[in-house]
Amino acid sequence: MAGFMKYKSVSTTIETVRLKLILTAVLFLFPFSQTSGASRPIIEIKDGQEIKVQAAQHFCYNNTIIPGWRETWTRIQVRVWSTTKLKVTVVNDEQDLKELEHFSIWKLVQYFVREQTNETTISVSLFNNKTCFRVDPSESRTLYTVQPSRHFDIYLFLVFLAGVLLFFYADVLSRSQVFHYSAGMSTGMIASLLILIFIVYRFLPKKSPFYMLVVGGWSFSLYIIQLVFRNLQVILTDHWHLAIGYVFVVGFISFAVCYRYGPLVEERSINILSWALQIFGLLLVYAGIQVQQVAFAIMIAAFCSKNLEYPFNTAFMLYHKLKPKKLEPRRLLTEEEFQRQSEVETQKALEELRKYCGSPDFNTWKTVSRLQSPKRFADFIEGSPHLLSNEVSVHMQEYGLGGSFFEDELFSTDEEDKEEEEDGWETEDDIKPEVTSPRMNNTRGK
């Protein structure tokens, strides 16, 4: 009997809690059901137009320009700001806006997930003809402003430029110690929570129930990183001392870890890092260009220019080797160049002769027996000059500038030229025949 009374009391308590939850849900969902079936007007907005309205409104932006290569770094944004908090819900078209008026569980979830801010920016795709959104201010009487704009985005261009530089300099960066430490410290400061969760994951035993906690920790870390980047300006302005302390502590720990393991040494690891940097660079190129066709064309061109470099160089070298070369006339040496080259080559030949005479292959006795002055030959091998001073002076007198040899050559050449010219005037045809008188012939005949 006591057990039955206890069971009845517990059942009554559960029914009471269930009834309270149902009443709370009905009271909470009543405001959402009030707009069911209501239809709000849609406000069309254009580039450069500024609209100030109150209460929850529906807006649609019509993109009339067909995207081309000129819109490579063009960004379309719709800026919404107010003095109080507001929420913005982005949809595709008017039909989705009408569905927002009807109550649904998904709408309720999105209502709590969306963050309230004083200012937000909606990025519109160049390829969407129409983009619609709804603005829900926290107070219905609050005045807020909606302004679309189309402009050149310098950040997109910088992302594209960073991707191109990273792709082409991936091989150099993968072997650089400066890049190793700077990338390690940057990764540690940006993803410190992710790294901490990964370290905890390494120490957890297998089949541990904490794996679900780790998965939730990864999601929470990503949310924290996104939240920090969204409020980075506020953090650097109001909490700059905490930001400096975080950068100093986490940066030092990251540097210590990078210094402990050191830069990559194995060639395969360096190649893997280089490939990863190239892939990341191509992703940055794709993210920095609004027009997909232009992005793919630049990515393919960059890939071909980097990886087809070696085949093109090989083909170019083969073409130059197989192509017949034109023989260019050799330049004659000047007198100073001839004198300098002769001295260098003479000294080189003498050194080679000394080395050969000192080698085991040299037959010393046979050579000495044929020499008139063996002592002079021995002095030459030991490093003495191969000519005596008087021999040098005699050579200069005979063969130097102004020597007897050059004078004989000059004068003999002039005389021989004159003789050749004189001899050249007389030929066999010019020889006169002998003429005899008839008397002499008769005398001889007798």
From Swiss-Prot:
Biased composition, class Acidic residues, residue ranges: 410-431
Spans through the membrane: 154-174, 181-201, 209-229, 239-259, 269-289
Coiled-coil boundaries: none
Domain of life: Eukaryota
Signal peptide range in chain numbering: 1-37
Pfam families: NEMP
Function: Contributes to nuclear envelope stiffness in germ cells. Involved in male and female fertility. Essential for normal erythropoiesis. Required for efficient nuclear envelope opening and enucleation during the late stages of erythroblast maturation.
Name of the protein in question: Nuclear envelope integral membrane protein 1
Upper classification of the organism: Eukaryota, Metazoa, Chordata, Craniata, Vertebrata
Gene: nemp1
